Amino acid sequence: MSDTERSLSADKKSDTELETPALSNVDPQERTRKHIEATAESDSDADLDPALGNGLPAHDDDEETGSRPVLDEATRKRQDLEARMDQILHKPKKKRTRRDEDDLEQMQDERILRLKDEMNIAAQKDIDTLNERLETGDTKLVAMEKVKLLPKVVKVLSKVNLADTILDNNLLQSVRIWLEPLPDGSLPAFEIQKSLFAALDNLPIKTEHLKESGLGRVVIFYSKSKRVEQKLARLADKLVAEWTRPIIGASDNYRDKRVLKLEFDVEKHRKKTILDTAKSKKKRSKRMEVDEEKYKSSYEQAAARRNRAAAPAQTTTDYKYAPISNIDAVNRNAGVGTSVDSSELYKRLNSKLSGNKHKRSK
């Protein structure tokens, strides 16, 4: 070994001896932390510089930014608008809570009760106006309060979603007051009658509602009164039939209708009619003849004076019983070999046809 090599090895040894005491004084945890930081720095340097680390090319942020498409202002606004629209459309719907339903029912009840009070006040004002007109004789006083309020009443009664609320709050009682005859004996305005009856026809009225409101008596009056227009009378009669059917337990199906039948003897009836006519002729008095003249129409009376026959007038008769048919039902499609062959009528027709054929052949 040369002198130069000995001097270099001595220098390295001295350097190592100088560094060793410095490392021995360092805390082990501090030494570990520095080692981790050094490793992280080396890894980051290797990523940034291809000369360091594994030799892979480093990622350039500028190149990635340049590869993305640059959006113009119109496209960006359109995308923002589409995103907001999707957010609105796919937004979950808020479910109606029980509290909201209770508040809605309470609002509907208050609305119907206010209308009920308004109807009662309007009816009372019209009654007061008519009483004042009867007392003073002033024909200028006209009861118009109900007519003014009628459009609002019809609007509420025609709402299907308020039908149960109307019936539960007994608005039918106010309807009955409006339909009742006035103090002077006249009926309400025709427009009131027509509108209210049309509304009643669409409401699901039950027996308990009729008992509570007392509406049934007024509707029966309209079905029997001669002062009511024929169309309204028929509608009132229809309502009475519909309301009465569940009370008596009748079905609305015509097939379920029971028809009372009774055997009818024509010969017996004819003999009885002859006997009754003979007895009535003997017992008839002049007073009865005078009474019959009263019930005759002017046309029949004029025909009787001229000793001429009068055309019979149309009468409406009701029958309690339907006659029992004594004709055997024969199938319309019946052919040869059925019960039709054995009937006397068929035999006579067949003999006549055969006789005609023999005559033609001769």
From Swiss-Prot:
Q: Which InterPro entries match?
A: RNAPII_TF_IWS1 (IPR051037), TFIIS/LEDGF_dom_sf (IPR035441), TFIIS_N (IPR017923)
Biased composition regions of type Basic and acidic residues, renumbered to the chain: 1-16, 28-38, 70-89, 287-297
Q: Mind telling me which GO cellular component terms the entry cites?
A: nucleus
* Localization in the cell: Nucleus
Q: Does the keyword Cytoplasm apply?
A: no
Question: Could you provide one GO biological process annotation from this protein's UniProt record?
Answer: poly(A)+ mRNA export from nucleus
Per the database record, which ranges form the TFIIS N-terminal domain?
173-250
Q: Which Pfam families match?
A: Med26
* Location, primary (coarse class): nucleus
List UniProt keywords, sorted A-Z. Nucleus, Transcription, Transcription regulation
According to the UniProt record, where is the region Disordered? 1-105, 277-297
What the protein does comes down to: Transcription factor involved in RNA polymerase II transcription regulation. May function in both SPT15/TBP post-recruitment and recruitment steps of transcription.
Please state which protein family the record places this protein in: Belongs to the IWS1 family.
Protein name, UniProt field: Transcription factor IWS1
